[in-house]
Each structure stands twice: as structure tokens, then as C-alpha cells.
């Protein structure tokens, strides 16, 4: 009886240690200009996991946003217009950071957003990218290296330059 209790206690301790270790290792990745972009821990609105390698070979803009951020919605609409005008030059991935408290699907419909939208449900991706506020965007080259980081609304001239420069 005592032996079974001891085994259960050891198993629980091992499980807790593994969870803590995996959470700590999640934070080890960081987003620095010139370095490889950290992995994503996001799911699309249909519940499918989305990974950076799905965008390999393409220039990609990761846009972190919140439903309660009016400027974020303005920027997403600008990104959407430019993505429609220049569909082959820059891929967009809109990463919602509201977690459980937000209804991202409802917000996308309300704001007529048709960009690829994903949820960072546990804010693991936001931590890996050292997010301070929204909107924040990262531009990755086709190999996944971070070229630029923008905190706040990106000016129209910078956005246009990003889309026009393949």
C-alpha cells in the first residue's frame, strides 16, 4: 500500500516537473531581428494547428492583435486591402491574443476580415515574440528569419513598401 502511494507520488512529481520544464523551454525562444522566428503555438478558427513551415519560401507578416484594440482592426483592414491588391508578394497571418475571453470568429465576421486568422489561446506565441502591446507585427523572410518588427500602427507608406518589395 505504501509502495503504491510512493509510486503515485513519484509519478505526479515527474509529471509536474515535465510540465514546468516544457513551459520554461517555451520561453527560451525569442524574437530578435536577424534571427530565426520562434515557433508558433496557434490554431486557426477551425481548430487546426498552424506552423511556420506552412509558409516556408514566402515572405510573411505576423500581426498580433486584440479584439478590443481599435487600431488593430484598422491595421488588419489595411493589411487585408494590400493583400488583395498584391496577393503574391507578402503572406499575412493575423494572430489574436485574446485567449478564452475573446470571440475571434465573431470579431472577424463583424469586421469583415477574410485574412488568415489564428488564436494564440495560451499566449505562448506572444511570450516567445516578447509581445508588449498590440498591434505588433513581425516580417519574416522566406527562410523564416525576422527582418522587421513594428510596434503600434504601421504607416501606410511602410506597409505599401512591404507589399511592393517581393
Identify what each model region corresponds to.
Residues 73-111, 121-127:
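Structural microenvironment flanking redox-active thiols in thiol-disulfide oxidoreductases
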Residues 52-70:
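Short active-site neighborhood of thiol/selenol oxidoreductases, capturing the structured segment around
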Residues 13-22:
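Bacterial N-terminal signal peptides
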Residues 26-52:
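N-terminal "domain-start" segment that seeds a small globular fold
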Residues 63, 94, 138-139:
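Hydrophobic beta-strand core positions in alpha/beta domains
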Residues 107-113, 121-164:
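Thiol/disulfide oxidoreductase modules built on the thioredoxin-like
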Residues 2-14:
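Bacterial N-terminal signal peptides that target proteins for export
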